[in-house]
Amino acid sequence: MVDNSKIRVVVGMSGGVDSSVSALLLKQQGFDVVGVFMKNWDDTDDSGVCTATEDYEDVKKVADEIGIPYYSINFEKDYWERVFEYFLDEYKKGRTPNPDVMCNKEIKFKSFLDFAMDLDADYIAMGHYAATRVDDNGVVHMMRPKDGNKDQTYFLSQLSQDQLKKVIFPLANLTKPQVREIAIASGLATAKKKDSTGICFIGERNFKKFLSEFLPAQSGKMVTPDGKVVGEHAGLMYYTIGQRSGLGLGSTKESTDPWFVVGKDLKKNELIVEQGYDSKLLYATSLDASGVSFFTGQPDHDVDLKCTAKFRYRQPDVGVTMHYRAKDNTVHVEFDEPARAVTPGQAIVFYNGEECLGGATIDRAYQNEKQLQLV
């Protein structure tokens, strides 16, 4: 029988209820648990309160309640260089990036993992809702967790096999309400703390205002697909494909339907808009994606596979045929049914039943082999 007390697990503790309960459960299972608070961003909010200071206080309280040692580590430099600069660069290209995917790949499961190994960790853990399965050959597979509503495999889709082998997901078989119940029953300081929302480093702040601090906004024309000027946009980076709110456009003589962003023309600095949720320009039949990462490793040959996919968080799976090209590590994905608002810069993540296979970054979308002007 394995003696868990000889297995050290370093837990990334955010000051939230999920990572608090992860640390508690591991401690109850007899592991040698160490808590670490990551400071990735100088996050003074709009009211002048540094939320990281409050969060670290909560980590200290919970660590004391559980009876584990704790540390704080600053990854602001790593975060800026590996996540935030990528985030800004994608927006400059007119794309809509997913910084949470990159944060997991580069910070939580790279910088933090390296730090944990320096603390003689055998494994790391956090508060993610995900699960793993080890096959007979010792290969670790990423699986969906019990709580499908909180499933975070989408955000973990760029992790490697080496990273996955070093991770424990204590919340794999729990629902969020059960996690809250455990925290309350155990009297943890974070038991009733509300979940954080928004992009990991922006938090609750106004996104438009935040982005304008780092990228100069360039206003331009809002045009219909046939070139008619209908308004002015504040800067292409503020809009995403399929967006309805914030356009400031009213009904026309022809239609009372709301307006939606259906494309961008980066060269002309024009935002392409059209009335109607079901605008044909919002529907893609296929896409190209690059930077493919499979949890079980990259195949050395081309692969064609029928599976399902998500191209945004929390959307229901859609049926696809994936064509992997080993030469340049890309995929061409064909949708079983036309897919609405496929967005360059976002992650597409592949599933085979309960298993998450991995993901890639969307580059282009097509409608019947004609490229949609999404960037």
From Swiss-Prot:
Residues of the site described as Interaction with tRNA: 128, 346
Top-rank taxon, per record: Bacteria
Family assignment from sequence similarity: Belongs to the MnmA/TRMU family.
Protein name per UniProt: tRNA-specific 2-thiouridylase MnmA
GO biological process assignments: tRNA wobble position uridine thiolation
Name of the gene this protein is made from: mnmA
Record carries keyword tRNA processing: yes
Organism, as annotated: Lactobacillus johnsonii (strain CNCM I-12250 / La1 / NCC 533)
Cited NCBIfam families: PRK00143.1, trmU
Protein residues bound to ATP: 12-19, 38, 127
Gene3D superfamilies: Adenine nucleotide alpha hydrolases-like domains (2.30.30.280), HUPs (3.40.50.620), Translation factors (2.40.30.10)
Active-site residue numbers: 103 (nucleophile), 200 (cysteine persulfide intermediate)
Function: Catalyzes the 2-thiolation of uridine at the wobble position (U34) of tRNA, leading to the formation of s(2)U34.
Region (Interaction with tRNA): 150-152, 312-313
This protein's GO CC annotations: cytoplasm
EC number: 2.8.1.13
Region feature Interaction with target base in tRNA, mapped onto this chain: 98-100
